[in-house]
Amino acid sequence: NLIQFGNMIQCANKGSRPSLNYADYGCYCGWGGSGTPVDELDRCCQVHDNCYEQAGKKGCFPKLTLYSWKCTGNVPTCNSKTGCKSFVCACDAAAAKCFAKAPYKKENYNIDTKKRCK
């Protein structure tokens, strides 16, 4: 679920940036998404959005699905092995790892999405 996803982000980035900093970034980080991603981090969010969309097509509710995971050496690892729990956990873990690798550019936080995300 979204709280677990936030915790995964903290795991992967070693707590260097609050999870909420990703909630309004670029064209895809946060609710919805459109246009061309503004950078590598925004692309991570686009991939995550697409993963959640695929989960929805499988009959899952990714923003609400509780799963089992652990943080080992700043790497989120899924314990859930089947069904929606496994699928959603994999979406979140991949995104958290992607976020940790991508540069965070403050100028892409809280952008005017109407102008920049066409």
Curated annotation (Swiss-Prot):
Cofactor binding notes: Binds 1 Ca(2+) ion.
Organism: Pseudechis australis
Residues the record lists as binding Ca(2+): Y28, G30, G32, D49
Function: PLA2 catalyzes the calcium-dependent hydrolysis of the 2-acyl groups in 3-sn-phosphoglycerides.
GO-annotated cellular components: extracellular region
Disulphide bridges: C11-C71, C27-C117, C29-C45, C44-C98, C51-C91, C60-C84, C78-C89
Tissue: Expressed by the venom gland.
Protein name: Basic phospholipase A2 PA-12A
Keyword terms of this UniProt record: Calcium, Disulfide bond, Hydrolase, Lipid degradation, Lipid metabolism, Metal-binding, Secreted
Enzyme active site: H48, D92
